[in-house]
């Protein structure tokens, strides 16, 4: 059974009834509370909104308002999603959203219980993170043409993403104020507002300097770069003086992968982050240090990379030990 693509899910959502006003108000209150309490990003809040609106539209008031749904109603919805070929990972994410939402409903006095706690968590596969080899990374980083301001900017972005293990959302929203060129470090505000400091290597600092001194003024046509709605001046800009989108960077990295002779379907922004982590471990990095660099809340999230590192050591042993 092939999971639905993003476009298929959106098309299916458009076929559902419109959102009832009461449910729309409930979802809006919940998202406002999440933002105030946890400072979640707009991207995360939009994911929560889509999941809750999908359930509300499917229910369409049949089993009562969204905040009063029972375990059987939620189970019916999860069963329907499975029949519509939603992946176990997508259903697991939905269940996590529902647990948070119904906990909020209990806090607000809308109900006395959390019905989602009675639902079984989907069994998930555990795919290992995919990483590029170090030679593939070198080819990918060298793919942009540095003869143009856009190419020089993109080279700097690729270098920075690999050097610091950034998420794509962290890269494209990075403010100038977060870069300390004198000390060679970045201050990153990651998921859930978690802050971390990431050191930069000589190569990434070199390309950042070239971008800031050559490409950025050219892209801005020497005009002052305005602050965005958050009051931050973006580090990486386009010719309209605005920050770049995640989708733009996604397309570029696929393009540069093809130029580097790497299958585009094997490369994504997150693959660069996985490569950063894998290569550090292969060269002897400490797992706790890697956790801090990646901004993981729990060491268990970071531990998946240890299996990849063990594979690397086994390969080295098999290649070089006289009795392997």
Curated annotation (Swiss-Prot):
Residues annotated as signal peptide: none
Positions annotated as active site in the UniProt record: 167, 191, 270, 273, 296, 305
Domain Core-binding (CB): 21-106
Highest taxon of source: Bacteria
Main localization, broad class: cytoplasm
InterPro entries xref list: CB (IPR044068), DNA_brk_join_enz (IPR011010), Integrase-like_cat_sf (IPR013762), Integrase_catalytic (IPR002104), Integrase_recombinase_N (IPR010998), Integrase_SAM-like_N (IPR004107), Recomb_XerD (IPR011932), Tyrosine_recombinase_XerC/XerD (IPR023009)
Places the protein is found: Cytoplasm
Pfam families, per the entry: Phage_int_SAM_1, Phage_integrase
Residues of the Tyr recombinase domain: 127-318
GO cellular component: cytoplasm
One GO term (biological process): cell division
UniProt KW keywords: Cell cycle, Cell division, Chromosome partition, Cytoplasm, DNA integration, DNA recombination, DNA-binding
SUPFAM superfamilies, per database record: DNA breaking-rejoining enzymes (SSF56349), lambda integrase-like, N-terminal domain (SSF47823)
Disulfide bonds: none
An annotated Gene Ontology molecular function: tyrosine-based site-specific recombinase activity
Extra remark beyond the main annotation: During infection by the bacteriophage Xf-phi-f1, it may be required by the bacteriophage, which may use host proteins XerC and XerD to integrate the bacterial genome.
Protein family membership: Belongs to the 'phage' integrase family. XerD subfamily.
Function: Site-specific tyrosine recombinase, which acts by catalyzing the cutting and rejoining of the recombining DNA molecules. The XerC-XerD complex is essential to convert dimers of the bacterial chromosome into monomers to permit their segregation at cell division. It also contributes to the segregational stability of plasmids.
NCBIfam families, A to Z: PRK00283.1, recomb_XerD
Subunit organization: Forms a cyclic heterotetrameric complex composed of two molecules of XerC and two molecules of XerD.
Protein name (record): Tyrosine recombinase XerD
Species of provenance: Xylella fastidiosa (strain 9a5c)
Gene that this polypeptide is encoded by: xerD
């Amino acid at each position: 059974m092939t999971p639905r693509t993003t476009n298929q899910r959106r098309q299916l959502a458009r076929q559902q009834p419109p959102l009832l006003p009461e449910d729309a108000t409930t979802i809006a209150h919940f998202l406002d509370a999440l933002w105030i309490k946890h400072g979640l990003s707009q991207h995360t809040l939009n994911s929560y909104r889509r999941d809750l609106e999908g359930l509300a539209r499917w229910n369409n008031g049949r089993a009562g308002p969204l905040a009063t749904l029972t375990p059987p109603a939620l189970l019916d919805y999860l069963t329907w999603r499975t029949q519509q070929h939603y992946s176990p990972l997508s259903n697991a994410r939905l269940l996590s959203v529902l647990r948070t939402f119904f906990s909020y409903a209990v806090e607000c006095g809308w109900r006395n219980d959390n019905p989602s706690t009675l639902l079984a968590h989907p069994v998930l596969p555990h795919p290992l993170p995919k990483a590029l080899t170090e030679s593939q990374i070198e080819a990918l980083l060298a793919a942009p043409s540095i003869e143009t301001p856009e190419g020089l900017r993109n080279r700097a972005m690729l270098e920075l993403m690999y050097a610091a293990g950034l998420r794509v959302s962290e890269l494209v929203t990075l403010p100038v104020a977060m870069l300390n060129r004198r000390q060679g470090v970045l201050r990153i505000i990651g998921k859930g507002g978690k802050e971390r400091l990431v050191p930069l290597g000589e190569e990434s600092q070199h390309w950042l300097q070239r971008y800031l001194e050559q490409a950025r003024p050219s892209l801005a046509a020497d005009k002052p770069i305005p602050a965005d709605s958050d009051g931050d001046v973006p580090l990486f800009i386009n010719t309209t003086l605005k920050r770049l989108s995640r989708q733009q960077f996604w397309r570029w990295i696929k393009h540069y992968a093809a130029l580097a002779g790497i299958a585009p379907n094997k490369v994504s922004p997150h693959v660069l982050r996985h490569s950063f982590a894998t290569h550090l471990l292969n060269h002897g990095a400490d797992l706790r240090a890697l956790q801090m660099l990646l901004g993981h809340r729990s060491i268990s999230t970071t531990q998946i990379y240890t299996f990849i590192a063990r594979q690397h050591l086994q390969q080295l042993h098999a290649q070089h030990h006289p009795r392997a």
